[in-house]
Amino acid sequence: MTSSSMTIAALATAPAAGAVGILRLSGPEALDVGRLLAPGVPAQPTPRHAYLASFVDAEGRSLDEGLFLYFRGPQSFTGEDVVELQAHGSPRLLRLLLTRALEDARVRHAAPGEFTRRAFLNGRLDLTRAEAVADLVAADSEAAVRAAAAGLSGALASRVQALEEPLRALHADMEGVLSFPDEAEGADEDVGERVTALRAQAETLLAEVGRGRLVRRGARVALFGPVNAGKSTLFNRLVGEARALVDDEPGTTRDALEARVEWDGLAVTLFDTAGLRETPGRVEALGIARTRALLTGVDLAVLVLPPGVTQAEVEAWTRDVGGTPVLVVDGKCDVAEVSSSPRQRVSGLTGEGVDALRDDMLGRLWGGGTPSAVALVSERHADALRRASEALGRAESASRVSTLEVVSGEVGLALEALGEVSGTVVSEALLDAIFQRFCIGK
């Protein structure tokens, strides 16, 4: 029996004390081995039926009493026979049960992500859904949970399929013309138009990468600006607690402070940075240097200004951020005179304008979209989509100046790249790279 067809076993719950712990087996011997641990279960148990059973050691002594569940393949998560033993969540007890299962020569320990990998290989999940399992396990915000759940239900798969199927049909039409030119006359008349439309679809999906990245790792937002502009007070107000020291003396904040918040389901790491000024002390200058380095790596920089700042000064402050998007606000509006400035006015002290500022920041981060519309397009997906789009761009150009054979070749390359997203074209090395990020037992 090959390693890939052996029965595998692993703990499906975290190795920590809890109310319930689960031992999972999948493969041709899952039921036999499961019944060695729970001999009171019938030889032909009813699939998807929970049996109250005694779990025993090799000498038949009871270790625990729990639930035994059998899922007959192919109607199971992995597409194989699956058995789950749900015991009390003692790490030592669960380790004893796992060790007992692994003592059987027909069983080996599952590799990271191997249960989900078998589900993919057995056609139970496409690759985007399989990756969504890992996204859901790793999700640490409401937006990440909802986006991963949408991926698991096929949101990304359906969009990839909507691009892949007409692309495959186009490729088949062109290959038909090339192979049987007399019988397929006229089948290639609209090739250029079809390629252009499909490239636009690929670009639309590729545009989701930035927002998908936000959902996966959370957003990074930095407050910056001149000293005594009210940044630290505003930071404390946005965080909801007094994290930053507030004082009228310039240079109070020397190291960037950070706090994690969740706004409308999106995880946001907020930074309060050292105030910028022309003649700081030596230690303060180090903080300012760190601020400038930080500003180039965040998703949004919020420039907080004191009263009376001119537009020329605003432009001078924004030179520090590189290509980072900047939102400019007037701080300390509670002490400033009402002005005709179009900038947003906020006060960290009173809370005036803070809710509107938070909404504006979220709007900038989402790029005008909504969290519910985010497709979890990963960096791996982005690389494949980028190659597909580039191939379609070359096909579009070739449709005007070159032969149908060249166009068909480029469309074929685009199909191969898309296949890496859906899983229709995938290597063992790629599968290894994808499933290694899963935890064992998933």
From Swiss-Prot:
The keyword Metal-binding applies. Binds 1 potassium ion per subunit. Its EC number is 3.6.-.-. SUPFAM superfamilies: P-loop containing nucleoside triphosphate hydrolases. It is found in: Cytoplasm. InterPro entries: G_TrmE, GTP-bd, GTP-bd_TrmE_N, GTPase_MnmE, MnmE_dom2, MnmE_helical, P-loop_NTPase, Small_GTP-bd. Mg(2+) binds at residues 232, 253. CDD domains: trmE (cd04164), TrmE_N (cd14858). Its cofactor is K(+). GO terms for cellular component: cytosol. One of its GO terms (molecular function) is metal ion binding. The keyword Nucleotide-binding applies. GTP binds at residues 228-233, 247-253, 272-275. GO terms for biological process: tRNA methylation; tRNA wobble uridine modification. It comes from the Bacteria. PROSITE patterns: G_TRME. (6S)-5-formyl-5,6,7,8-tetrahydrofolate binds at residues 24, 84, 124, 442. Keywords: Cytoplasm, GTP-binding, Hydrolase, Magnesium, Metal-binding, Nucleotide-binding, Potassium, tRNA processing. Residues 218-366 form the TrmE-type G domain. It holds the Pfam family MnmE_helical. Exhibits a very high intrinsic GTPase hydrolysis rate. Involved in the addition of a carboxymethylaminomethyl (cmnm) group at the wobble position (U34) of certain tRNAs, forming tRNA-cmnm(5)s(2)U34. Belongs to the TRAFAC class TrmE-Era-EngA-EngB-Septin-like GTPase superfamily. TrmE GTPase family. Homodimer. Heterotetramer of two MnmE and two MnmG subunits. This is tRNA modification GTPase MnmE. It comes from Myxococcus xanthus (strain DK1622).
